[in-house]
Every structure is written in C-alpha cells, then in structure tokens.
C-alpha cells in the first residue's frame, strides 16, 4: 500500500473539459442510482432545512421516520416556533445531538419574529440562523431556493479528498480552504443541474465513496479519481488523531417518593450544555475512592438537598458520547428527608412511570424507564 505524499496546500486546477465530464458522469450516475428520499420530493425550504439538520449526524434510514413525524407535529415554521421547547425535544427524542433541535427551535422563532414566518431567501440571512453553517446553508439554497451554492459536509470532504488526493486532515480549517473552491468549481451554474449535482455528490459519499471499503467499481469518477489511480483510498481522507476518550462512572438514583413506589423524581438538565432541556434520573460522577452508593447519596444531597436511602443496584448501562463514555450505575433509592431543590437543574418533578412518556429523556435514561416498566412489581429491599 502506498503512503500519501506530504500535505498538498494547493490543487492543480481542473480543466473545463474535466469539470464538464465530472458533472455529467455524476449526474447520470445519480439519475440511475439516487435513492428516492422524501426531502428530495420537495422544494419547501422548511422541509429541506429540517432534513439537512436531521441528516447532519444521523443516517438516512433513521431520519426518515423522524422527518415525517416532526413535520406532522409541526407542519409549519410558525407552528414550530410557537411550540414549547419540551415538545420539540420530545419529537427529537432518540435522534441525539439535541443542540440541533434547540437551534432549530430558536431559528424558527427568529424566522417568525424577523422574517414574518417565511424562510429567508438571502444567503447571509440563512447562514445567520442558529445551527446553520456554510454547508447547510449551501444545501438549503441549492435544494429549496434554486440558488446554486457549494456544499462541504463530511461526506463531500471525503469524496473531494479522494478525488484530488488531498492529504491534509479534513477536519482542519486550512483543508476546508482548499476544498471550498473545488466544490464551487465543480458546481454547475444552472439551478436544476446544481440541484442534481449537489444531491449526487452527497449520495456518492453516502453510498459509494464510503469511509470504509469504497465501491470504486461502480463510481462514476473512477477514471479521474487520484486516490483510485494511486491506490490511496484506504489512506484518504487523512483525519486528525483523536485523543483517547475518557470514561466516567455515574451514580444514578431511581428515587421513589415513598414506599408505594408510585412516583419517582426526575430533573430537567440545564439549558446550555450536553443534553440541555432533557429530563433525567438524578445523579452524577463518582469521585476517586468513593463507593457507588455513597456517590449517589452525595450527588442527591449536593444537587437536590435531600437525604435518601440507597438500595439495591438495578442495572448498569454503558453509553458513548462524542468526547467521553459513561457507565450509569443505577440504584433503587427512597426519599428520607428534606425539601427537594433544583440546585443543579432547571426543575424537578415527581412523576409516575406512565407520566414519564410525556417527557423527553436521553437514550440511556429511556433504557432505565424500559427496565422499570418491564418490571412493574419490582420490589427491592433497601439497605
Ligand atoms: S473512485 Fe473510489 S475513492 Fe475515488 S471517488 Fe470513486 S469511490 Fe471514491
């Protein structure tokens, strides 16, 4: 296997003939191979915007159902803007990266207040909305407003890095500076052709020029692709090496109000931060040399100001976030004394298991709820 040469800072310009050939072959390939997806059937800016946000961190197969349900629940930008944030997060529940939902909601409110509820048509106004970067704005402009704009999401960066054998880390801003002009150079001027080209470029990255095992045998760009010519598909794109991901043990309380085990205490996470605006079972990080039951009791005293009895361990749940991993150690707990105060959360609520379905929880917490629901007669002996 050949290794990449030192990072190239500039690219050899593509001739008009090569550009034309790349456009034509990619669009023809897309017409024959592009998947039929609901957001490709519409030019509605709101629907296109929603799909682009949902697709930022999530696979197409997962997005389709969420996309339909979200549009059914919030059929217009104004209906989204007017909804409480809790309802928006509930619709987003399970899709992850919840800042996307919070930003979508904030942006809808800005559109309602500044643009009379109509999605803006000026590129500068689009890119000024929360949660919309240059590439997402480019996609919305191209797909909904028929304004050809280049795109540069993760899939597109990978395809372009291979096409031109760009051997600089694709996460770096300096690499994007090389790639933006390339994406723009390849884009046709005609709005309809630009729609097809950008859709095709995304499709190529998602289904053919994949991160692992790209299927070069059916790629329309094989003849021009420098990575293919030099057998560098496995080396490109170059990524910045990630630091080892830290792991935290988290003590979590399923905290019952009394021995009838009807109501449980849940906490609303702070707005700004990981999983902001979602509800959770309270708890926190274990300190060095601390037992897990002691961690749960301490966290509840520090964050809620009440004394509890910590009982048996119910379950252990492992979960990975982008920058760290956690193991949730979940304990059956009973309220003892004190007045619950939301010292580290926005709000606290005693709820029954049935009532929990009205609140949005992170995925790992939903697994705790599933466990509790599947064991309705769970009667554990408190220590
Ligand atoms: S030939 Fe292979 S590596 Fe090159 S763009 Fe096509 S799928 Fe990607």
Task: Identify what each model region corresponds to.
Residues 332-375:
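NUDIX/MutT-family hydrolases
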Residues 281-315, 352:
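The catalytic Nudix box helix
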Residues 146, 249-251, 301-339:
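Active-site segment of metal-dependent pyrophosphate-handling enzymes
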Residues 218, 252, 266, 328-332, ...:
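Conserved hydrophobic/aromatic beta-strand scaffold that supports enzyme active sites
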Residues 25, 29-215, 221-229, 307:
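Catalytic cores of DNA base-excision repair glycosylases
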Residues 1-16, 34-35:
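Short, contiguous pre-domain boundary segments
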Residues 229-280, 309:
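N-terminal strand-loop-strand
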